[in-house]
């Protein structure tokens, strides 16, 4: 984590303190030790808000944590607070419990790290404006030094506390009373990082920081993550170990596992059964996504202009679902009456075996995962085919001619989003809306900066369900969006070249 120039934490003058109360069952053996403190620039209400946000998002403090599941929250049941007062002796003298949360921390790799249950207690001082938030892991007290048996992502201490004092905030560890040795460098680094993360969040809140993108608006995060972990455990090792492409398996395997997990959860929302539809991966590349979806019981196929080495590593029943075909949308041929086309290669027709004309079976779901020059055609083809939906993850900036875009792209409708990729996403959304789609946008949790998914499963109006897109209307839309001249001939030339090479 980058450390800002203003960040200058210090050791408190009095490291041993009894300010935060110690849970009754730990009082005889443990005490709080203050580790670091830093000046504040925010009010107590900001501390309260940001600390609870971090309680709900522990992954912001450790890359090995995936998420937390909330087991119990007093905000949903006030009676919990009265029941838990007995945990602290003489609490009523100075503090009152304002919130009690039990949570379960879920690591990214459950083969390396265990889950951990933890209680979070928020205390408000009655006479002052002080706040204390304590993290208390559920210790196995039958063990000697039970904190040494906690997962690696938690420091080897019996508890962590943050004490807001108005002008400063400090981080404390719950340690044994006979604790005499110096803290390890790891414990010090962890305290430093925890305090810095808190300070950055609070400072950002004061300065009006708002997230540029909102995740998990289409598919719930927990459902996606649970499915991703299942897929990763089933497939990741064998796929990485047997990778035959020149590309990095550390990126591509886990990216496609995440996309497969997202699609599976999206389809659970969209369809009542996986027998209700079939998928088509347009420009399927190495075929990994097709393999994963077929293995998970979904029906479909993929095609690409060029066969990949990976295809032969899949089971035969998967290989027969991967086709070497070039997409030449049939409606471009219909435009012949409006724009001149050069001669096709001798003896070559639109019905050639290695041509896919963009006609799909009813109830198809089209996938465009970094499909490059095919990307702009997905919303059009999905609209032209019966009961057809799509999800596109755009990458390189191509228009309907198949060329890299050289014309001025529109500004994103969200002013927080900038850059050429954001403008390309905006153009694709506008094109999709022009042919009738009500587009859902989801920044996917994948290891790629080109991670926006455009999802078309709803039309702008119910009236469009009963009307088709005419050739004339489509031609006008295509021409308005800088035309398609060049795509048809280039695609046919690729198809002709492929047929000659076999």
From Swiss-Prot:
**By its UniProt entry, which InterPro entries does this protein fall under?**
SAM-dependent_MTases_sf, tRNA_uracil_MeTrfase
Q: Which GO terms describe its biological process?
A: tRNA methylation
SUPFAM superfamilies recorded for this chain?
S-adenosyl-L-methionine-dependent methyltransferases
Position of the signal peptide: none
Q: What is its main location?
A: cytoplasm
Supply one GO molecular-function term: tRNA(Ser) (uridine(44)-2'-O-)-methyltransferase activity
Instruction: Report the enzyme's class at the first EC level.
Output: transferase
On whether tRNA processing is a keyword of this UniProt record, the answer is yes
Q: Which UniProt keywords apply?
A: Cytoplasm, Methyltransferase, S-adenosyl-L-methionine, Transferase, tRNA processing
GO CC terms, sorted = cytosol; nucleus
Q: Which reaction does it catalyse?
A: uridine(44) in tRNA(Ser) + S-adenosyl-L-methionine = 2'-O-methyluridine(44) in tRNA(Ser) + S-adenosyl-L-homocysteine + H(+)
Q: Does the keyword Transmembrane apply?
A: no
Subcellular location field: Cytoplasm
Write the Enzyme Commission number(s) for this entry: 2.1.1.211
Similarity remark: Belongs to the TRM44 family.
What this protein is reported to do is described as: Probable adenosyl-L-methionine (AdoMet)-dependent tRNA (uracil-O(2)-)-methyltransferase.
Q: What is this protein called?
A: tRNA (uracil-O(2)-)-methyltransferase
Task: Name the gene behind this protein.
Answer: trm44
């Amino acid at each position: 984590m980058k450390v800002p120039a203003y960040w200058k934490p210090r050791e408190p003058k009095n490291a041993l303190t009894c300010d935060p109360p110690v849970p009754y069952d730990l009082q005889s053996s443990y005490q709080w030790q203050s580790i670091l403190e830093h000046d504040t620039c925010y009010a107590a209400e900001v501390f309260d808000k940001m600390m609870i946000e971090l309680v709900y998002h522990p992954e912001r403090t450790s890359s090995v944590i995936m998420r937390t599941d909330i087991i119990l929250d007093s905000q949903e049941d006030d009676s919990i607070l009265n029941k838990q007062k007995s945990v602290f002796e003489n609490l009523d003298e100075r503090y009152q419990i304002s919130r009690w949360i039990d949570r379960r921390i879920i690591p990214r790799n459950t083969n390396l790290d265990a889950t951990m249950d933890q209680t979070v207690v928020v205390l408000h001082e009655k006479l002052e404006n002080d706040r204390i938030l304590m993290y208390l892991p559920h210790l196995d007290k039958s063990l000697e030094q039970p904190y040494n048996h906690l997962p690696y992502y938690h420091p080897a201490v019996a508890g962590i506390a943050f004490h807001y004092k108005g002008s400063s905030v400090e981080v404390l560890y719950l340690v044994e009373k006979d604790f005499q040795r110096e803290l390890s460098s790891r414990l010090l680094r962890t305290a430093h990082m925890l305090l810095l993360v808190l300070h950055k969040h609070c400072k950002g809140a004061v300065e009006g920081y708002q997230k540029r993108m909102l995740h998990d608006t289409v598919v719930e995060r927990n459902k996606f993550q649970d499915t991703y972990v299942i897929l990763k455990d089933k497939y990741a090792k064998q796929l990485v170990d047997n990778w035959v492409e020149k590309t990095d398996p550390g990126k591509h395997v886990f990216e496609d596992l995440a996309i497969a997990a997202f699609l599976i959860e999206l389809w659970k929302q969209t369809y009542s059964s996986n027998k209700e539809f079939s998928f088509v991966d347009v420009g399927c590349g190495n075929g990994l996504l097709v393999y994963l979806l077929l293995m998970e019981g979904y029906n479909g196929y993929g095609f690409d202009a060029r066969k990949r080495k990976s295809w032969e590593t899949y089971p035969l029943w998967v290989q027969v679902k991967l086709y070497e075909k070039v997409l030449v949308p049939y409606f471009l041929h219909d435009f012949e009456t409006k724009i001149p086309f050069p001669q096709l290669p001798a003896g070559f027709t639109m019905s050639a075996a290695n041509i896919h004309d963009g006609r799909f079976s009813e109830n198809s779901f089209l996938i465009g995962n970094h499909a490059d020059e095919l990307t702009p055609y997905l919303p059009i083809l999905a609209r032209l085919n019966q009961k057809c939906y799509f999800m596109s993850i755009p990458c390189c900036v191509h228009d309907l001619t198949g060329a890299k875009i050289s014309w001025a792209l529109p500004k994103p409708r969200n002013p927080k989003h900038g850059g050429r990729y954001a403008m390309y996403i905006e153009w694709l959304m506008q094109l999709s809306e022009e042919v009738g789609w009500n587009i859902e946008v989801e920044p996917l949790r994948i290891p790629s900066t080109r991670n926006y998914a455009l999802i078309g499963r709803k039309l702008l109006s119910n009236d469009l369900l009963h009307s088709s897109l005419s050739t004339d209307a489509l031609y006008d839309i295509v021409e308005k969006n800088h035309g398609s001249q060049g795509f048809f001939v280039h695609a046919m030339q690729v198809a002709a070249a492929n047929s000659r090479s076999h």
